[in-house]
Amino acid sequence: MTKGILGRKIGMTQVFAENGDLIPVTVIEATPNVVLQKKTIENDGYEAIQLGFEDLSTKRANKPQIGHAAKANTAPKRFIREIRGANVNEYEVGQEVKVDIFSEGDIVDVTGISKGKGFQGVIKRHGQSRGPMAHGSRYHRRPGSMGAIAPNRVFKTKNLPGRMGGERVTIQNLKIVKVDPERNLLLIKGNVPGPRKGLVIVKSAVKAKAK
């Protein structure tokens, strides 16, 4: 069954394996989450647990947020996300979920919002090749042909300049190198989406290869 927790990306560092290999890792701080609600097939048509992360001041929370959190005997939460596919029988409303649900060597998927890059051209945004930069070329970094004349329009799938980044991105099959329950930290091999202090969701890998 799926396990998951919400956290914040702290940054990157490196650790040494027992054989001396240098491993780049991303540090994720996941303070205890609270189960706010359990979704069941009978009531909702699917199974999931709803987790809350980071307390929100009651001055900044509205009445629905305060009332929803009160059912779990907790403070309103800044971030609320669902973990689908979790075994709801293992959780109770108001229960805390900590980093120790994962262990060293687990394979996980990490979801976050990618860094915003602003308005970018087709070379940076889509990896398009540029034209010659010399010898009288008048084509350098432009998008190029918009398509054939016959349709009298530009197709929706045409790669064009525009806003880049700021999208929900999931990186799959990342390995947990270390779990630190005392400091609520997860060390995950490689990089994860988003800037420092960005919200991330760490879940059991969907496509993890069987050992």
Curated annotation (Swiss-Prot):
GO cellular component, one term: cytosolic large ribosomal subunit
Single GO term (MF): structural constituent of ribosome
PROSITE patterns per the UniProt record, alphabetical: RIBOSOMAL_L3
UniProt keywords, alphabetically: Ribonucleoprotein, Ribosomal protein, RNA-binding, rRNA-binding
Alphabetized Gene3D superfamilies for the sequence: 3.30.160.810, Translation factors
GO BP term, example: translation
Region (Disordered): 126-147
Coiled-coil ranges (or none): none
Pfam family, one: Ribosomal_L3
Family: Belongs to the universal ribosomal protein uL3 family.
Function statement: One of the primary rRNA binding proteins, it binds directly near the 3'-end of the 23S rRNA, where it nucleates assembly of the 50S subunit.
SUBUNIT field: Part of the 50S ribosomal subunit. Forms a cluster with proteins L14 and L19.
Stated name of the protein: Large ribosomal subunit protein uL3
UniProt gene name: rplC
